Amino acid sequence: MTAKRILIICLFISMLFCLPSKAQKPGDIVSEQTIRQLGEKHFFSISPIPDEIFHLMQGKTYKKNCTVARSELRYLRCLHVDKDGRKIVGEMVVNKAIAADVLDILKKLYEAKYPIERMRLIDYWDANDERAMRANNSSSFNFRFISHTHTVSKHGKGLAIDINTLYNPYHKRLKNGKDVVEPATARPYLDRSKHHVYMIKKGDLCYRLFKAKGFRWGGDWKHSKD
């Protein structure tokens, strides 16, 4: 083997090592080197719902009685940072009307290293809110009607966003005095005077960014908290 051939082979091998690893999937931790090589913009995108994602949603978030057209929804990809500083690929399905605003918010949260533990499609939990919330997942679209009505909920349209759901639970006190907490494992986090890195506090960055885009915060609701 000539020296020239050896040099070409060595250059080829070195190029292979310099290339980023296979395409990053939602939930994957991404190295700083990969982000530098590909650029942050590579990880932030809005697209129509891809076929493989729409197939995953069938019978889960996109139920048989879903009245929201596929064309009304958008698939977001982003990066988010967990409490340990790891940079993770996230994904979310939202209504196209808010897609650009939500991606802008998620990018700003990432840049500020605002901690978000998990951001996967709730379809991986079979669209079961309780299970996904126990996993502290952040998500949006999950088709459903408001209880005892024919009105599609905000989540059912992909117009509501839940962030760090275990530490920011839904809480309502019924007239009989019973407390409804979702997820049920979130009772320790009802006391909002306590601090946890995944708690959203009124006035913090997550609160301010969503409010600036016209979102209402569930923590401000009078008859329930979300």
Briefly describe each language-model feature range.
Residues M1-I8:
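Bacterial N-terminal signal peptides that target proteins for export
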Residues I8-F17:
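Bacterial N-terminal signal peptides
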Residues L19-A23:
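Sec/Tat signal peptide C-region and signal peptidase I cleavage site
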Residues Q24-V81:
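N-terminal module-boundary/linker segments of secreted carbohydrate-active enzymes
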Residues V68-M133:
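Active-site acidic/histidine clusters and adjacent loop/turn architecture
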Residues A69-E72, V152-G158, L209:
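Extracellular/periplasmic catalytic domains that process cell-envelope and extracellular macromolecules
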Residues I116-E117, R131-L166:
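Mid-length scaffold segments of soluble, non-membrane domains
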Residues I146-H148, I161-D226:
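Catalytic cores and adjacent binding grooves of peptidoglycan-active enzymes
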